[in-house]
């Protein structure tokens, strides 16, 4: 008998033991990564390494798991370390309060991991991590853009080469291609186009983090700050955790190979006819 027996009932004894011996790194423990990390430790993953340089800001309160009024100004990885250990004291959790970049990739990836979760929102750091994982043959799953979106039903999981309608994914694809990486990166993304920003609110936006600016990714220095909601980053993080656990267990993951949204009745009929082998009627 143990606190996580409900998970063992679902995945079986062998699956549970596999998860207990798994080593996973989560890079970026903000809105996406905090939920991914907690879901992984609750699922029974025995070792987690958490990497993030940042501290909790007031503007994190709307979407990040560790963010409360009491935790503003505290280290994100420190808070998640404490939270994960309080959930499963037997888990080996390591916190690295550092900014992931190409110069420290070898050091941070050196311990060896069964899976890496990319929940970084800085393009330079994100590309550095994905290239490092690709070059090492390291399994990784990456989150594309959750900001500016509202519809949780449109999150998909595919190879990055199949992403569309996602400005972040487009930039990442181009940067990866410039470094010789065309595909082989699994990612969670949405085909919902980013919603527009309220110009009145945008004009009034200012960084209100009480601990001030940081040297890597300050909101006050961004050209555009996307609007966010509570559920979309969480859904992305939980999706990443689900992909990792299913992959570790050797189980298939439902992806965007499924039939896309059918759209209008005419398009729906055309797609149904195509699947049945019927000739489409003239428009």
Model feature map: region roles:
Residues 1-283:
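Adenine nucleotide-associated cytosolic modules
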């Amino acid at each position: 008998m143990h606190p996580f027996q409900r998970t063992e009932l679902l995945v079986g004894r062998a699956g549970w033991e596999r998860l207990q011996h798994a080593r996973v790194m989560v890079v970026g423990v903000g809105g996406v990564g905090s939920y991914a990390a907690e879901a992984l430790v609750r699922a029974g993953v025995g070792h987690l390494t958490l990497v993030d340089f940042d501290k909790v800001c007031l503007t994190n309160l709307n979407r990040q798991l560790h963010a409360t009024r009491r935790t503003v100004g505290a280290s994100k990885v420190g808070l998640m370390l404490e939270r994960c250990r309080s959930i499963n004291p037997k888990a080996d959790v390591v916190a690295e309060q550092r900014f992931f970049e190409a110069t420290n990739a070898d050091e941070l990836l050196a311990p060896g991991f069964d899976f890496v979760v990319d929940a970084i929102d800085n393009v330079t750091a994100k590309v550095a991590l994905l290239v490092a994982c690709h070059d090492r043959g390291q399994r990784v799953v990456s989150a594309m853009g959750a900001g500016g979106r509202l519809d949780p039903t449109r999150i998909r999981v595919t190879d990055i080469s199949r992403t569309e309608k996602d400005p972040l994914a487009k930039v990442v694809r181009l940067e990866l291609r410039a470094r010789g990486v065309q595909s082989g990166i699994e990612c969670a993304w949405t085909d919902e186009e980013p919603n527009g920003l309220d110009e009145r609110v945008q004009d009034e936006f200012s960084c209100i983090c009480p601990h001030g600016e940081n040297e890597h990714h300050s909101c006050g220095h961004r050209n555009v700050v996307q609007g966010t909601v509570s559920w979309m980053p969480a859904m992305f993080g939980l999706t990443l955790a689900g992909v990792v656990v299913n992959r570790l267990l050797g189980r298939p993951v439902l992806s965007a190979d499924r039939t896309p949204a059918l759209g209008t009745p005419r398009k729906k009929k055309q797609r149904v006819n195509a699947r049945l082998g019927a000739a489409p009627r003239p428009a």
